[in-house]
Amino acid sequence: RDQPRSRGLGDVYKRQELYDLTTLQKEASKRYGFSPKQTLNIMQSLYEHHKVLTYPRTDSRYLTNDMTDTLKDRIKACQNGSYKKAAAMLLRKEIKASSRFINDKKVSDHHAIIPTEQYASLTSFSSDERKIYDMVVARFLAVLSAPAISEQLSVKASINGELFRAKAENIKQLGWRELYEEETQTKDTIKAGNIPVKGKEYPIGTISMTEGTTNPPGRY
């Protein structure tokens, strides 16, 4: 039988910033094991040969105000592959300049890395080029998408006199996190329709026990 559960206030997940070269290199290394030089070479190919991404050697994570009117054309250019749905949704609404990604003072020689207005022919990319291109497109669309809002849940359940506790995340609005679906869908994420009702009895599906040991904290 479920006991009273607590519901935390809605958390608004902070949207990540657009990529500069250093940040892109770090994330490509973490995700794919690419060296900084390898990522730069791939970026150079996507910039010079395919012409689908902007200049890579930048230390800015912002765009200039005069680029606002070009954003929809850039979205159209990457409206294919796994981002077709997200791009289509963005194209149906007005794209307004926001200080989250527009700041003339934080752009010196070159702005953040984003898609160009050149349509991307995904079949012409190598496997590594596709990985880097997808990273940039996902970040670009995420920055322009709606915020992600979730609610933290804490549930207590009594089974044969033993009290069990569980915590989970109830996603209220997926927003930009839809572009990172694999990272969003974890075992601790539940849908609103699956939230247990207070006081209601539920059948036990399976019971499993996980054994483990605790480790002492590090010396430093």
What does each model-identified segment do?
Residues K14-A28, L53-T58, P216-Y220:
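Short acidic, hydrophobic short linear motifs in intrinsically disordered regions
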Residues D2, E27-A28, D134-L141:
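Phosphate-interacting basic helix/loop segments used at nucleotide- and nucleic-acid interfaces
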Residues S150-A168:
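Long, charged, helix-prone linker segments
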Residues D2-L9, Y13:
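Single conserved hydrophobic/aromatic residue that forms the stacking wall/gate
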Residues G81-A87, L141-I149:
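Active-site phosphate-binding and catalytic loops of NTP-dependent enzymes
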